[in-house]
Amino acid sequence: MKKKMMSLAGLFAAGLMLFSCSSEVKEASYQIIPIPQEIVLGQGGAFTLANGTKVMYPEGNEKMQKNAQFLADYVKELTGNTLQVVAGTEGKGILLQVTPNEAQPEGYQLKVSADKVVINGGSEAGVFYGIQTLRKSIPAGQ
């Protein structure tokens, strides 16, 4: 499998502060395989994952809808928070998108800011791998 391209702006801070409702901070696992080619820590606040957070995907893309539902189901199981899976790409929340990249179809970028998480993959499979990395950043037991 080819190495994954990603830029993880603020991911570590997001992982530690992902759930603002918790009084106890749990550590996230960052044992990501394959090892990212690049990690960039950015400035700014952490993204807060809460009930009603939107998981957005491009309208009409069934594979991306399945990716979005997979993420929402995982978060529900782990945290009890119910995420909204919606077609569209505008607004705050988690945005899943594809920018075709024949050279690295399984590559992805993961960018985290205070109001949005963007997973941009070279294909739907790349987005899926980005979701796996995001899952690793959610502290266990939240």
Regions found by a protein language model. Name each.
Residues 1-9:
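Bacterial N-terminal signal peptides that target proteins for export
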Residues 22-142:
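Contiguous, structured surface segment used for ligand recognition
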